[in-house]
A protein has these predicted regions:
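Soluble FAD-dependent oxygen oxidases
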Residues: 2-490
């Protein structure tokens, strides 16, 4: 049993045992009458409830309740937030009740599924965290469609889908929740062939900021918004129906390393990466990972051998110091190698821009490398996108605005509790500013940073005004309001 499942069992036991406060549910008539005018009041909302009524749909936990800290903990230990209450929801009706309670008590709301938000947007200081930890079911609708609740992790999703020889184009980090990755776009090994995670969504169950429950299908305006712009902006998705795709029979990984790099060699390796990756077939994914003065280059393939891949392998075999040529392996076994750490850690990770080619970063790369080469532990990574991500049909059906860019970069830094990260985080910001000043301003919403300038355009591009209209329709009182949520028009 995974650590995540053990935590879920622990929390569920406490909830069912009645070890926390239960608050009253609200009717649909009450929903329409509620006002959010109490948002600034200082008193504890729990103290206002004169008679606690048990609800089978949602359990409310105070800071003094035993599972509160466990439920509130996000993946990033460096981005802690403490809500006034946690609403542990058992089902969609529980989410509706929790939203209505928050409106009545003037509490702002955040939504936690997997808790992997880099800036911990899945919690909120002094507000209500709608916690979906217990909503992780996977149910087959038919032979090719599957219903998945938002707190299901990618590990759990693959465990359910792969025995049926089906996949969804999504990521590889095992502890990430389906809800967050889907609503922000979602990419991984299979995206170049099948599109983003959000592109596989056929239908969702959605609870808006009044507590009203909607069944949303492809082609609707709200579905357009949820595909790339749905992370905590105007409501809660409690269930997704996905189209699945045939799982490949095998998966092959090739790895190359280059050590003790200087700037000229690093730039030459990077130019070679851009040259050959643009020719790769859709079954291939590549990542250029520069950690201090060491490069690790990853290439994966789940299709047949092909000339473009052979050419890239040959080119990097000649210029790298360490070469590991892979052979086809079992898909499930291969994916487990990329599940990564599934317990909370200290880190800073953020998008470092979308690129078209090497020329996109040519004017800034010398400055970027200067910083990476003097800061051990700072990681600069460039991943391949492209392929079917840039499908016009997918583009029309989603608000995700960056489909034409074939590369996505990111910055990463990890540290332990005893280390002071201040200097490295300053270098992190320096790189972000260099990229911005050199015109690299498009960013991936699932890799957020509070340091991004003009984040509205960075994440959503020309889709932002349309998202504001949807915000007005489904969250007119701005219940979902954090630093980088879509804002109501003034």
């Amino acid at each position: 049993m995974t650590q995540i499942n053990k935590r879920r069992d622990f929390v569920k036991l406490l909830a069912l045992a009645g070890l926390s406060l239960y608050l009253p549910a609200f009717t649909s008539d009450e929903r329409k009458k509620q006002s959010n005018s109490k948002k600034n009041k200082e008193k504890d909302p729990v103290s206002e409830i004169e008679e606690a009524i048990k609800s089978n749909n949602v359990t409310y936990l105070k800071k003094s309740d035993e599972p509160f800290d466990e439920l509130n903990q996000g993946f990033n230990l460096a981005a802690g937030k403490v809500p006034a209450l946690i609403g542990l929801c058992m089902n969609t009706q529980g989410v509706s009740e929790a939203i209505m309670f928050a409106r009545k008590e003037g509490l702002k709301v955040a939504v936690k599924s997997g808790g992997h938000s880099f800036e911990n947007f899945s919690s909120i200081d002094d507000g209500l965290q709608i916690n979906l930890s217990l909503m992780n079911e996977v149910k087959w609708v038919d032979q090719t469609a599957v219903s998945i609740q938002p707190s299901c992790t990618l590990r759990e999703m693959y465990d359910a889908l792969l025995p049926n020889n089906r996949i969804i184009p999504t990521g590889s980090c095992g502890g990430v929740g389906v809800g967050g990755i889907t609503l922000g776009g979602g990419y991984g090994f299979f995206a170049r062939k099948y599109g983003l995670t959000c592109d596989a969504v056929k239908e969702v169950t959605f609870v808006d900021a009044t507590g009203e429950i909607h069944q949303v299908k492809r082609g609707e305006e709200l579905m357009w918004a949820l595909k790339g712009g749905g992370n905590g902006n105007f409501g809660v998705v409690t269930e997704f129906t996905f189209k699945t795709h045939p799982a490949p029979e095998s998966f092959t990984r090739h790895r190359f390393k280059a050590y003790k790099l200087d700037k000229p060699r690093a730039k030459e390796l990077m130019k070679t990466y851009f040259k050959y990756t643009k020719e790769l077939p859709e079954s291939c994914f590549a990542a250029f990972v520069l950690n201090y003065k060491t490069l690790v280059l990853l290439i994966t393939n789940y299709g047949p051998k092909n000339e473009a891949l052979d050419n890239m392998i040959k080119a990097f075999s000649e210029i790298c110091d360490d070469v590991s040529i892979g052979t086809p392996k079992n898909l499930a076994e291969s994916l487990r190698n990329y599940y990564g750490i599934e317990y909370p850690i200290y880190f800073k990770n953020a998008s470092a821009g979308y690129y078209e080619n090497y020329e996109t970063i040519a004017s800034s790369i010398d400055q970027v490398l200067d910083i990476v080469f003097r800061k051990r532990g700072l990681i600069y990574q460039i991943n391949t996108l492209g392929g079917n991500i840039n499908n016009p049909e997918f583009e029309n059906e989603s608000c995700y605005p960056h489909r034409s860019s074939p590369y996505l970069s990111e910055l990463q830094y990890y540290w332990d509790e005893k280390k002071d990260p201040t200097a490295l985080l300053k270098s992190f910001d320096e790189i972000q500013n260099i990229l911005y000043e050199n015109g690299i301003r498009k960013q991936y919403r699932n890799y957020p940073s509070l340091g991004f300038k003009d984040w509205e355009r960075a994440y959503f591009g020309d889709s932002y005004e349309r998202l504001q209209e949807i915000k007005k329709a489904y969250d007119p009182e701005n219940l979902f309001d954090q630093q980088q949520t879509v804002k109501l028009k003034e």
